[in-house]
Amino acid sequence: MMRKFHEITGTETGAVSGEAGTIGTRKVYVTGSRPDIRVPMKEIVQKVGAQDESGTELLKIYLYDTSGPFTDPGAAVNIRAGLPAMREAWIEERHDSMVLSQLSSEYGRQRLAGRVEGGQYFPEERLPRRAGKGCNVTQMHYARKGIVTPEMEYIAIRENQRRESLPELLKKQHPGDPRGTRMPQVITPEYVRDEVAAGRAVIPCNINHPECEPMIIGRNFLVKINANIGNSAMSSSIDEEVEKMIWAIRWGGDTVMDLSTGVDIHETREWIIRNSPVPIGTVPIYQALEKVGGQAEELSWEIFRDTLIEQAEQGVDYFTIHAGVRSNLLEAAQRRLTGIVSRGGSIMTKWCKAHGQESFLYTRFEEICEIAKAYDVTFSLGDGLRPGSIYDANDEAQIEELKTLGELTETAWRHDVQVMIEGPGHVPMHMIQENMDLQLKYCHGAPFYTLGPLVTDIAPGYDHITSAIGGTMMAWCGTAMLCYVTPKEHLGLPDKNDVREGIVAHKIAAHAADLAKGHPGAQARDNALSKARFEFRWQDQFALGLDPERAMGIRKALLPEDAEDKEQYCTMCGPDFCSMKITRSLREGAAGGKEE
């Protein structure tokens, strides 16, 4: 049976126990033009100066928050009920969608009818929503009609992170090298609309996922992080995957992909979506393959189509579709050192060879678009021929597939379906800029979403590092979202600790890229932490860090038992050799001399 909320999170309340950033932080909400636009942020309040002085200056720093109600002490979260449907009123007031009388997917109806006592089913049976006759419900469609939706206003507030409230000291920032990005000092709802209308950004928010807090993926916005979870035929259960999702967003996952390939895929996904405040992505071909007993040759358009509808009606926000794997590219892929390393790519390759014809993902793409626009499912056009080794980087198969993805992007845009493009993979550092340039050239500026790339193949067990190195460079060049890699990459299914390490490594990469691009306000957090470090405000340093618990734990473990945490040194230099302590004493001495 599904475990209770407190058994998964470690607390009887709605707040996740030991949440990232609880040290010196609190959750706040910024209200928009209407009371139901409430944007969550982390507020870090820091006292600057002597703690016993009444005139102590307070610095407030606001950070992007992906953790949803799970970190709100005032929220009574129950995973058996799911999260509040915060977007439901926005969806209903547009009057362009309808609630269906039953599920449209045959498989979905079968799963509902086949429920047995004791099964791990989400308690609430909800009816899905889809576009009304002749209507298009995508955020791109609204944007192209000149409509600024509540989702767009929500995103503008979220991306700005209350930069206007920063003290001047923290606003100082190096210009950066934007490399073609176009970032205004203030993100407005109209700017969000314009970027979505042009296809340069996507808002992955299915109308059947009203629990989703709107976010945006685009090269002119903050770099985002995706975390992969999902069971396999060999390990994991539904409650473990829900736990991993909550854990992933706690550490900063902007989106989560459920890549389950084991049993109970439908039920696992329902639990995850109903409890997720971030967009959920999937690779539908995985579940379609399960439906035919793992035999790729037995796949059909009819089974895949039903799977798309099933998942869209559950609320999946974006689909990875490997429609760029064309039969004419298979020979080039066979010449590689490591062949085809994408699961979706290899599945469709096997199908194409068995049937001697083009992939139905490509030939039926117009019909796939019709499904997507009825629910506002964003496409993540999969790189089924991405290089799986440095040896194969930027080869013919990869680049020719990219051209096909550009063709499919234009097809999707004719339907006002939102699109992002998946990228490699394994690419050495000196070839990363070329990857970005080719993506922009062939895919018309659609957001790039890359798996790293890993910049070397020699680090099994440390591939979260090789990926973060490549991800930093690729995001600086223009990638909009990085898919995290964990230490278990190439080795096995990640656990909670792997998820944490993978996300933190890629949050570092994303932030470093924002700094390099000169993203407005990106340096404020660095400035605040540096000031706290120079003033030996240890708790403030921890609060501003990406992993406060780890930093605090390391310091505590290294201090002598009788030492207080107010000491103005660490065990690296000790009390007599700390350069910052010496510098401070010199400053204080100089100031005292001037007063005399």
Curated annotation (Swiss-Prot):
GO MF assignments: 4 iron, 4 sulfur cluster binding; carbon-carbon lyase activity; zinc ion binding
Pathway: Cofactor biosynthesis; thiamine diphosphate biosynthesis
Organism expressing this protein natively: Syntrophotalea carbinolica (strain DSM 2380 / NBRC 103641 / GraBd1)
Stored PANTHER family: PHOSPHOMETHYLPYRIMIDINE SYNTHASE, CHLOROPLASTIC (PTHR30557:SF1), THIAMINE BIOSYNTHESIS PROTEIN THIC (PTHR30557)
Enzymatic class: lyase
Reactions catalysed: 5-amino-1-(5-phospho-beta-D-ribosyl)imidazole + S-adenosyl-L-methionine = 4-amino-2-methyl-5-(phosphooxymethyl)pyrimidine + CO + 5'-deoxyadenosine + formate + L-methionine + 3 H(+)
Superkingdom of this protein's organism: Bacteria
Protein name: Phosphomethylpyrimidine synthase 1
